[in-house]
Design a protein with these regions (language model features):
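Active-site loop/turn elements of alpha/beta-hydrolase fold enzymes
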Residues: 46-51, 132
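Alpha/beta-hydrolase active-site loop
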Residues: 58-80
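Gly/Ala-rich beta-loop-alpha elbow adjacent to hydrolase catalytic centers
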Residues: 89-94, 98-99, 131
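Short, surface-exposed "cap/lid" segments of acyl-processing enzymes
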Residues: 1-46
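Loop/turn elements at helix/coil->beta-strand transitions in domains of secreted/extracellular proteins
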Residues: 2-7, 40-45, 81-86, 121-128, ...
Length: 277
């Protein structure tokens, strides 16, 4: 019996659906919190994509294989549960994979080209993105593009310049005016297509993320802020993985209660709704 909107969890690069190691902690904490607060196992879903070998992280891209598989998984959950909508909680590379599988359309991947189909927006209630690289990653500028995950087509390339600023992606403030850098084709397309991910979209990240670095800045804007976001939460002290592992209660608040968590002590620097563009 389904009484809650089912939740699908999508992990990031070299992580897993559930805890398997210190570096691949999965969604175990979040799933347990939801179970402790009235959800049943029939309402919570996660699947692993890729492997947990961190040395393979630089090889992963937004390819057809993973996007088609994850989209089929979302459709299977909708079909299996019979629910009119599902919600997605995503982390790291899972954010951009999740956004693309919902938006649908063409993918020009390193493993070939494919079409994901029509947008699934009408079937997604809440989309939560934790520590995503929506505008790319500054570590991918310049020579970083030599790594597949940083490529200019379907990777995390942030662009090498913006205005007169060159190879200074993570500086804040930027020395010169910056307006509209050219970056990863897939990311640029997603950020400008005006296709929403869900009825309600939330973004959350940490100012001291040890993977994204640079205070989450990419050419003067937070890369973890999904353009269509209704609200955002900015943490002060969490690592990249802790932004997922230590925020189960906040995830529940945003996805189930559909509101923002209250700022508490020093953990949250900002918890606010985002004005519509």
């Amino acid at each position: 019996m389904i009484t809650h909107t089912p939740v699908i969890f999508i992990h990031g690069n070299s992580d897993a659906a559930l805890h398997v190691s210190k570096t691949a902690t999965g969604w175990t904490n979040s799933i347990q919190y939801f179970l402790d607060n009235g959800y049943t196992q029939a309402e919570l879903y996660a699947t692993s994509w890729g492997d947990t070998n961190t040395s393979n992280a630089v090889k992963r891209t937004h390819n057809c294989r993973d996007l088609l598989r994850l989209r089929r998984f979302v459709l299977a959950v909708l079909d299996y549960t019979g629910a009119p909508k599902v919600s997605l909680i995503t982390h790291s590379m899972g954010v951009t994979l999740g956004r693309k599988l919902i938006k649908g359309g063409a993918v020009n991947g390193n493993d070939g080209s494919c079409n994901l189909g029509n947008p699934l927006t009408s079937k997604i209630d809440v989309f939560l993105g934790l520590a995503g690289g929506n505008y790319g990653l500054c570590n991918c500028e310049g020579a970083g593009t030599l790594e597949p995950t940083c490529n200019k087509k379907n990777g995390f390339w942030p662009g090498d310049s913006c205005g007169l600023n060159t190879y200074t992606c993570g500086l804040k403030p930027l020395p010169f005016p910056c307006n509209g850098p050219t970056y990863s084709s897939l990311l640029m397309s997603m950020n400008t297509d005006n296709v929403r991910e869900a009825s309600l979209v939330f973004s959350a990240w940490s100012e001291v993320d040890d993977l994204i670095l640079y205070g989450d800045q990419v050419w003067g804007r937070p890369t973890s802020l999904i353009p269509s976001s209704s609200g955002k939460v900015v943490y002060t002290s969490y690592t990249h993985m802790q932004t997922k592992e230590n925020t189960a209660a906040d995830q529940y608040t945003m996805v189930v209660k559909k509101t923002l968590p209250s700022p508490r002590s020093s953990e949250i620097d900002d918890s606010s709704f985002v004005p519509a563009n």
